[in-house]
Amino acid sequence: MAMQKLFTYIYEFIEYRKMVLLEEKVPYDKFVQMIFNTGFFRINAETLNHGIVSVFIFGANGKYVHHGGDMRTLLTNALNEKKQYEELILIVDKPILGKKNILDIIVEQRAANPTVVINIYPYHLFCINIPKVSAIPRHKLITQEEAQAFLGREYLQPQDLMQISASDPPVVWLGGRPGDFVQIERPSETAMHAVVIRYITKSKI
């Protein structure tokens, strides 16, 4: 069931982020077959800035999420393809996020590739279309200029704002990065919406 949802919503995520697929979408049975046979499924897409984003969906029991050397080789080879990488998104079963050998490789690859955003997330972030969940307030990234104008009006510094993690589900779907600002519209008893600004901080993983 998780794989069926992942297959559906990862493509909705790519569309929501306004990315363009670089390969034709495969049928679901081929998606499952590739994860079962090779241990992962990869989607390549291009951003509005012409950067490349590669999404890797890993099987829960494949070699890449249990053997650090295999994960290191896979990521190193991908990043050596000389593409204009903007981001690598690694999607794994939640227990993998507790494996030190895998997380150490993520840290290692980030240090070796400082211009590429490398993030690892659990399946459940992509098993639902987060922006369509009615219980979640609307989130929107604002520009640095808009944020500075707001801070100036309110006589605030970024550190004065309440924070939100880069791993928060709506921020992940938006593509927010540490140092960005997100505007959140919450229902209000005195107005249609109460607008708040949050400062995005680095995630723990």
UniProtKB/Swiss-Prot annotation:
Keywords: DNA-directed RNA polymerase, Host cytoplasm, Transcription, Viral transcription, Virion
A Pfam family hit: RNA_pol_Rpb5_C
GO biological process: transcription by RNA polymerase II; transcription elongation by RNA polymerase I; tRNA transcription by RNA polymerase III; viral transcription
Signal peptide as annotated in the record: none
Keyword Phosphoprotein: no
Subcellular location: Host cytoplasm; Virion
InterPro entries noted in UniProt: Arch_Rpo5/euc_Rpb5 (IPR014381), RNA_pol_subH/Rpb5_C (IPR000783), RPB5-like_sf (IPR035913)
Top-rank lineage group of the source organism: Viruses
A Gene Ontology molecular function term of the record: DNA binding
The keyword Protein transport appears for this protein: no
Family, as annotated: Belongs to the archaeal RpoH/eukaryotic RPB5 RNA polymerase subunit family.
PANTHER family listed in its UniProt record: DNA-DIRECTED RNA POLYMERASES I, II, AND III SUBUNIT RPABC1
UniProt protein name: DNA-directed RNA polymerase RPB5 homolog
Organism annotation: African swine fever virus (isolate Pig/Kenya/KEN-50/1950) (ASFV)
